[in-house]
């Protein structure tokens, strides 16, 4: 079976114009008001469960669901950082469950929530917030019920469309997310601005899917013009999310 790639999805959905046109510096961080469905309401509290370490299904959706990763270094005696991590178009949370990414999160006892989008990509990419925000809110509520989370160390991140969504959702919900980690984003389109989170953006110079000149370089310039604290790393590579970039992003998240 042919796997839907980010290129296939953007072209078939007619979104390639959107992914570049939204990145002219004058409107790269422009507010796109939404009627409703943009805010996250779950907040950390006192957990009522004692989770087993490891990767566990969220158990919140049929078909498309996601995972929560509880590192072996987690202890309920100390509040942990939390990262919401979002996949690219045509992918799923499972894209993040292979390899050795867990080792990067284990060092700092970072709890990771990895939701699936309700459709092939995230709702805002289609131009309407709602279903994915509600699902992420439920996933956060589950994480806060299971794990003791530091309210001052909550981040949202993602790759490709997931990075676009992380930037947009994170700025919209900056009263929850203090840090945004975006790997190869296409654009940023918050519904409202609730604060100025710290932002890490990494992007490959040879990216042919979302060319860096049309995306991250414009996004970063626009964010800096609006006084967002941004760290931008360009690397030699294509449309990918490397272990090295993830490690750098986690260091940024943890203030190193």
Per-range role (PLM):
Residues 79-81, 108-111, 150-153, 175-179, ...:
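Loop/turn elements at helix/coil->beta-strand transitions in domains of secreted/extracellular proteins
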Residues 152-195:
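Primarily recognizes the serine-hydrolase "nucleophile elbow" in alpha/beta-hydrolase
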Residues 202, 208, 213-220, 224-256:
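C-terminal catalytic histidine-bearing segment of alpha/beta-hydrolase fold enzymes
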Residues 2, 10, 14-17, 22-81, ...:
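A domain-start/cap signature at the N-terminus of enzymes
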Residues 59-72, 77-147:
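Serine-hydrolase catalytic machinery in alpha/beta-hydrolase-like enzymes
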Residues 96-102, 183-192, 217:
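Alpha-helical scaffolding within the catalytic cores
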Residues 87-89, 144-147, 159, 163-166, ...:
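Cell-envelope and extracellular/periplasmic
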């Amino acid at each position: 079976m042919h796997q839907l790639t980010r290129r296939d999805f953007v072209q078939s959905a007619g979104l390639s114009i959107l992914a570049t046109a939204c990145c002219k510096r004058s409107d790269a961080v422009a507010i796109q008001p939404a009627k409703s469905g943009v805010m996250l309401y779950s907040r950390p509290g006192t957990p009522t469960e004692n989770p087993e370490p490891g990767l566990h299904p969220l158990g919140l959706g049929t078909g498309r669901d996601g995972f929560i990763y509880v590192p072996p270094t987690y202890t309920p005696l100390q509040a942990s950082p939390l990262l919401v991590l979002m996949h690219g178009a045509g992918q799923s949370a499972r894209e993040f469950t292979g390899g050795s990414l867990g080792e990067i999160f284990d060092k700092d006892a970072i709890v990771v929530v990895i939701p699936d989008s309700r459709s092939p990509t995230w709702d805002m990419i289609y131009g309407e917030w709602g279903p994915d925000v509600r699902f992420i809110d439920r996933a956060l509520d589950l994480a806060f019920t299971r794990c003791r989370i530091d309210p001052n160390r909550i981040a949202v991140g993602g790759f490709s469309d997931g990075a676009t969504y992380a930037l947009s959702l994170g700025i919209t919900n900056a009263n929850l997310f203090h840090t945004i980690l975006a790997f190869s984003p296409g654009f940023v389109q918050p519904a409202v601005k609730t604060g100025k989170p710290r932002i890490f953006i990494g992007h490959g110079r040879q990216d042919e899917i979302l060319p860096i000149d049309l995306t991250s370089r414009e996004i970063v310039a626009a964010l800096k013009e609006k006084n967002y604290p941004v760290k931008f790393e360009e690397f030699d590579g294509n449309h990918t999310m490397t272990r090295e970039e993830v490690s750098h992003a986690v260091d940024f998240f943890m203030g190193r």
